[in-house]
Amino acid sequence: MKSLKTITIIVLVFFTSHLSFAQKSKPVPDLANVKYGEHERNVLDIWFADKNKITPLVIYIHGGGFDYGNKEKINARPLSRLLKAGISVASINYRYKKIAPLPAAHHDAKKALQFIRSKADSWGIDKDKIGVWGSSAGAQISMWLAFSDDMADAESANPIEKESTRITCVASNIGQTTMESDFWIKHLAKYAPGTEAEFKSKTRLQIYGVENMEEADEIAKSISALALISTDDPPIFMQYFMNPNAIAPSKDNPKKFKGWVIHHVDFGIALKEKMDELNVEAHLKYPSSKTKYNSLVEFLIDKLNKQ
C-alpha cells in the first residue's frame, strides 16, 4: 500500500498539472488591459473571432460580490466555444464597492459597452449584435444593462457617451435578479432565518454610500432586473444549480451555505414569472428543468449568429 504522503504527492501533481493545462488552454487575448475609463480597474481584454470580417461580440462581466474577482476569471471553455462560433469576446474589470459604492460598478460596465461600440469599426464588431454574460455580481450587472432603457446621451460632448447601451441578449449565471430589501428579507427568512438583519444594518448603507435605508432602497430598485424589465427588453438565459425545492446544504460549511442561499434559483423563478407575464423571452435552467438551450453559450451563439 502506498503511504499517505505518496498519495498526497500524486494528487498534488495531478491537480497542479491539470490546472496548468487549463490555464495554458485559454486563448491569449488579442488586446489586453485596454483602458476604457480613468480608474485603474477600468480595463478590458478582447479576443477577436475573425480579424478579416465583422463579428458579433459577447461582453463577460466577472462575479465576486462586488468585492473581488477579475476579467481573467473568464472560463476557457465557453470563451473558446464562442470564438469558434465566430463571436468575439471581451472581458472587463470594474470598480469594487470598497473603491466606489454601488452603482459605480454598473456605470463602469455601461462605459465599457459604449467604449467597445465606439471601437466597432476599427475592431470589426457588429454594433447590432452585442450580448452580455455575467456570473453572480457580474450577472446582476449584466441584467441591469440588458433591462435599462437606452442610456446614450445624445447631448454629450463625449462621442463615446452618445453610443447606445442596448444589447441583443443577456446570459446570467447564478444572478441576483433583485437587490431590493423586501425580496431579500423574505428570501433570507425562508432559507437562513436570523440573517435578515444584514438588510437593515449600516453595512447596507455603506454598499450604496448613503445615509438612510430609503436612499439605499431607491438605488437597489434602480439596478434590479425585476423592477426594470419591460416589454421591449432582450431575451435572457438564466442558470442555477439547485432545484426549487432542494434541501439547503449544512450550515457546518458557512461559505457553501451562504453561496447556496444568495445564488438561489428563486431569483430566476421570480424574473421568469415576470417576463412570462410581459411576453418577453426568458429561459431558466436548473437541474430538473427542461429548456430550449442546454447552456448559456448555446443561447448566446443562437441569438448572436441569427441572420
Give a label for each model feature.
Residues 1-26:
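Bacterial Sec-dependent N-terminal signal peptides
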Residues 23-53, 230:
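N-terminal cap/lid segment of alpha/beta-hydrolase-fold proteins
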Residues 26, 182-228, 234, 263:
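Mobile cap/lid helix-loop segments that gate and shape the active-site cleft of serine hydrolases
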Residues 31, 114-190:
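Primarily recognizes the serine-hydrolase "nucleophile elbow" in alpha/beta-hydrolase
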Residues 45, 236-246, 250-253, 259-307:
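C-terminal catalytic histidine-bearing segment of alpha/beta-hydrolase fold enzymes
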Residues 54-65:
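Short beta-strand element of the alpha/beta-hydrolase
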Residues 71-90:
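Short amphipathic alpha-helix adjacent to the substrate-entry channel of hydrolases
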Residues 100-121:
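Alpha/beta-hydrolase active-site loop
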